[in-house]
């Protein structure tokens, strides 16, 4: 039987392996370009960026949440699995949606567009006024819904700070950036290609993990069908056993009271719950052995009173 959190641990292991692959890719790229580097510094930089992108985009919590649903189903807690059954009936639909959403979130996070900027951009839009330098800020439907739900608060700690005069020579700065652009272009393209390969590998891992869900659900359904069949077979076997014993008991030349007592014990066997039925059978067998023991002791005492001797076995 699987452990309580085996699927969740597998998902965490895949994410950790993806991080290690990112570190190896970064160091390999630097070595190929002949750039000296400090491994601990590269490791720290990649870890900070990787943790931020995975957490801010929600990619980390997505497979872990699905893994928790699988673990709960494997431990006979089907509430979460049933709620997601209809949505996950078509595996291509959630796989495609998750792939597209995760890809967009990671691209935005890697470019410095964090969750705060994405939420603000989704809540507001700006409309320019023709012929004027001012503009109109419009609230989107998402902002209206948040207002209705009471999810908007007023920040009373706003402080009007003094604006400093910008004295930067933008023309000189632009010329410097233009000179560096060509030298950085090839390096940026190489980093981007490496990132695409890592993202594609991660998407493949996520897709494989999502395919586990319907497989596990089918396996659980098969186990339930087998368990129901086994329980019915045991119930039929127990019913057949009690009927056979009752028929055999009626054919014996025993006292009617003894027959009635044994028949009452047999009828007390629970034919619905197999576990209880085995306990009842054990009790009946123990009672029969106890009655036989008492009969033997009575017969032994009678022989001794008649001054006879007895022995076991054949001489």
Curated annotation (Swiss-Prot):
Residues 1-149 are annotated as: RNA-binding. One of its GO terms (cellular component) is host cell cytoplasm. It holds the Pfam family Rota_NSP3. GO terms for biological process: regulation of translation. It comes from the Viruses. The keyword Transmembrane helix does not apply. Homodimer. Interacts (via the coiled-coil region) with host ZC3H7B (via LD motif). Interacts with host EIF4G1. GO terms for molecular function: RNA binding. Residues 208-315 are annotated as: Interaction with host EIF4G1. Residues 170-234 are annotated as: Interaction with host ZC3H7B. Its main location: host cell. It is found in: Host cytoplasm. Belongs to the rotavirus NSP3 family. Plays an important role in stimulating the translation of viral mRNAs. These mRNAs are capped but not polyadenylated, instead terminating in a conserved sequence 'GACC' at the 3' that is recognized by NSP3, which competes with host PABPC1 for EIF4G1 binding. The interaction between NSP3 and host EIF4G1 stabilizes the EIF4E-EIF4G1 interaction, thereby facilitating the initiation of capped mRNA translation. Residues 166-237 form a coiled coil. This is Non-structural protein 3. Residues 150-206 are annotated as: Dimerization. Keywords: Coiled coil, Host cytoplasm, Host-virus interaction, RNA-binding, Translation regulation. The keyword Coiled coil applies. It comes from Rotavirus A (strain RVA/SA11-Both/G3P5B[2]).
């Amino acid at each position: 039987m699987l452990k309580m959190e085996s699927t969740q641990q597998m998902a965490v292991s895949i994410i950790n392996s993806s991080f290690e692959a990112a570190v190896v890719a970064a160091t390999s790229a630097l070595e190929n370009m002949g750039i000296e580097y400090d491994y601990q510094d590269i490791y720290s930089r990649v870890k900070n960026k990787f943790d931020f992108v995975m957490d801010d985009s929600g990619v980390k919590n997505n497979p872990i949440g699905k893994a928790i649903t699988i673990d709960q189903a494997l431990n006979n807690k089907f509430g979460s699995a049933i709620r997601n059954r209809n949505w996950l009936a078509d595996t291509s639909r959630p796989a495609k949606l998750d792939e597209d959403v995760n890809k967009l979130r990671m691209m935005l996070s890697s470019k410095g567009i964090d969750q705060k900027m994405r939420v603000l951009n989704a809540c507001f839009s700006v409309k320019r006024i023709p012929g004027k330098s001012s503009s109109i800020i419009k609230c989107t439907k998402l902002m209206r819904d948040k207002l209705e739900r009471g999810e908007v608060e007023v920040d009373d700690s706003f402080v009007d700070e003094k604006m400093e005069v910008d004295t930067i020579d933008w023309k000189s700065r632009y010329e410097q950036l233009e000179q560096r652009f060509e030298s950085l272009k090839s390096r940026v393209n190489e980093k981007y290609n490496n990132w695409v390969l890592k993202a594609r590998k991660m998407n493949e891992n996520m897709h494989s993990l999502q395919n586990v869900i319907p497989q596990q659900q089918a396996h659980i359904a098969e186990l339930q069908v087998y368990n129901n069949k086994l329980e019915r077979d045991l119930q039929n076997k127990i019913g057949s056993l009690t009927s056979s014993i009752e028929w055999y008991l009626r054919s014996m030349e025993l006292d009617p009271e003894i027959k009635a007592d044994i028949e009452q014990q047999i009828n007390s066997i629970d034919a619905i719950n197999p576990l209880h039925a085995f306990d009842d059978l054990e009790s009946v067998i123990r009672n029969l052995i106890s009655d036989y023991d008492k009969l033997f002791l009575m017969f032994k005492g009678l022989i001794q009173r008649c001054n006879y001797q007895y022995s076991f076995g054949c001489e």
